[in-house]
Curated annotation (Swiss-Prot):
Pathway: Purine metabolism; AMP biosynthesis via salvage pathway; AMP from adenine: step 1/1. It comes from Lactobacillus acidophilus (strain ATCC 700396 / NCK56 / N2 / NCFM). One of its GO terms (cellular component) is cytoplasm. Its EC number is 2.4.2.7. One of its GO terms (biological process) is adenine salvage. It comes from the Bacteria. Its main location: cytoplasm. This is Adenine phosphoribosyltransferase. It catalyses: AMP + diphosphate = 5-phospho-alpha-D-ribose 1-diphosphate + adenine.
Length: 175
């Protein structure tokens, strides 16, 4: 029987700013059975995409992606915020509501031709996904899918990356 994960995601009004509804996944993470079930669903998706490696953007992508990689016996590649990785890196920038940020991966993190699935907690505007896709492709890999706990379809992230196969456990329309 499929789990309705939306029952376990807390909605916090006006966080971090007024007018925002923050979707909090920590109730899932705090329950071992739910965390395992969510991980398994994302792992089944990654397996269906014939992934060779899992990428997770900092920071919650680590929490989501590492157990997926472990379940599948695959490697995990962190996409880090700037100046956190010790060796030579590839960098890609993305826009935020007020400004921009960047993600970095070690230049040898993705091997040419590797099939990559990105795992993260939430897809909103797809800025992080776009930057990660750019990094993966610049390193010679192919982004074959992206898996999220939560998707906010009204922010049109899918439309910005129509060539990326996207899977999400829960979709929240509206606020």
């Amino acid at each position: 029987m499929a789990i309705d994960f939306s029952k376990y995601i807390a909605s916090v009004q006006d966080f971090p700013n007024k007018g925002i509804v923050f979707r909090d996944i920590t109730p899932i993470l705090q329950n071992g059975e739910l965390y395992r079930a969510a991980t398994h669903e994302l792992a089944e998706y990654a397996k269906s995409r014939n992934a060779d490696v899992i990428v997770g953007p900092e920071a919650r992508g680590f929490i989501v992606g590492c157990p997926v990689a472990t379940e599948l016996g695959l490697g995990f590649v962190p996409a880090r915020k700037p100046h956190k990785l010790p060796r030579e890196v590839e960098r890609a920038s993305y826009d935020l509501e007020y400004g921009s940020n960047s993600l970095e991966m070690h230049k040898d993190a993705i091997k040419p031709g590797q099939r990559v699935v990105l795992c993260d907690d939430l897809m909103a505007t797809a800025g992080t996904l776009r930057a990660s896709k750019e990094l993966i492709e610049n390193l010679g890999g192919k982004l074959v899918g992206a898996a999220f706990y939560i998707e906010l379809p009204d922010l049109k992230g899918r439309e910005k990356l129509p060539d990326v196969d996207i899977y999400s456990l829960v979709k929240y329309h509206g606020a």
